[in-house]
Regions:
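A fold-wide structural signal in alpha/beta-hydrolase
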Residues: 7-9, 122
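His/acidic metal-ligating clusters that form di-metal
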Residues: 38, 119-153
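Core catalytic region of metal-dependent phosphoesterases/phosphodiesterases
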Residues: 2-7, 14-115
Length: 153
């Protein structure tokens, strides 16, 4: 019987806002606890870290900043893909999470990124782009350029 070992913690639709900072902090701490209990070193946010695409309050930005610092100090690398709630301009690669893209062990996905989960598994992560906009072409380009037939994708 094989033992299953978690490789990463995947999170989506966190939707942090000025109105739910305590809940965000509690959920983040729970995620860090899970990472600690299972020896997980990679946290991957697949989109919608933020609730509002129009603006972020300073308290919301600081809560996310503190959460990111707490995670990276615990030895956890964070990858963030921008969701539709994370971008003012839906076709731009830039979103609110790019404020933290230069932090150590924080990786913010521009269009797409590939994470090697194990020797035979690659996880493809794409930031949000509108379905009636550039999404389909970006996806086709990624598949054509990056799909690796020698591993599970």
């Amino acid at each position: 019987m094989s033992k299953k070992i978690p490789s990463a913690l995947l999170l989506n639709d966190i939707h942090v806002s000025k109105d739910n900072i305590p809940e965000f902090q509690k959920n983040w701490d729970e995620a860090l606890y899970i990472c600690d209990q299972y020896g997980i070193e990679d946290m991957i946010i697949g989109g919608d870290l933020w609730l509002s695409r129009s603006s972020q309050t300073l308290s919301t930005l600081m809560a996310v900043r503190q959460a990111i610092i707490k995670a990276t100090k615990a030895g956890i690398s964070i990858t963030v893909a921008e969701g539709n709630h994370c971008k003012v301009d839906q076709e731009s690669v830039l979103g609110y999470s790019h404020l933290f893209s230069e932090y150590p062990h924080v990786y913010v996905v521009d269009d797409y990124s590939i994470i090697n989960i194990s020797n035979d598994v690659e996880l493809y992560i794409m930031s949000y782009f509108p379905e009636n906009g550039s999404f389909v072409e970006r996806l086709k380009k990624m598949v054509k350029a990056e799909l690796n037939a020698s591993v599970h994708n």
